[in-house]
Each structure stands twice: as C-alpha cells, then as structure tokens.
Amino acid sequence: MSSARDVVFPAGRQALYERHRYSPAVRANGLLFVSGQVGSRPDGSPEPELEAQVRLAFQNLNAVLAAAGASFADVIDVTIFIVDPASKFERIWQLVLAEFWGEAPHPTATAIGVTWLYGFDFEIKVVAKLPEAAA
C-alpha cells in the first residue's frame, strides 16, 4: 500500500505551498480535499479589504479546483471560517450567495467563528466529488 499523496497544485502557487509545507489539495477515492483557501496575494500577504479578500479566496479556491479538473459545482461540503462573524457574516454571506454559490442543489455548509486567521478575515475549505475524467 502506497502512502504517497496525490497532491494537486494550482499554477503559479507551488512555491507558496512549499514554503508553508502543506498541500493545497489531495485526491483520494474520487474526492478532492482542499485545504483552507484565504484571500492571499501571490506573495502570500492578505488582501486588506474584506470583500476583495473573500473574492480572492474564491479565486484561489477555483484555481485549486480547476487544477484537479473540477469546479465549484462539484463541491459537496464547505466549511468557512470568519474572524468576528457577528460583524462580518452577513456581508460575507450575501457576497458569497450573489457571486459564487450557484444554483441548487447546494453543498452542505458550516460557518465557524474564529479569533485569528493569520491576518486574514475569511477562509474556505471544501470537499469536492471529482468528475469521472478527473478522478
């Protein structure tokens, strides 16, 4: 039994993941497990404005999904982390619904309030069912 992980790297960001020593996504048994994606610029720094940070987190997520031959339509489970959700959740959720969520059936979703995300305000991690051709 091989212990090698089938890691997926989006184009242009491998050095960032290697520096922080984690995999952006791992394929296993027809599923794609995507690490938490934040609104980080190419150098890893946070996008300062909240809405821009959420959009960039989704761009980064979509790049990982695309590198595996998937899209957000293949996502079956979503976990989002929000710093200070009492003041930010509604603004973030309305943006997510309007720009990224898509049509029903929707993935399962869990939102978790946290106190710290290494300078970020929003993080999203997902599990996707890979299309047959990408599995």
Regions found by a protein language model. Give the residues of each.
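N-terminal presequence-like segments and the immediate start of the first folded domain
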Residues: 1-59, 63-76, 82-135
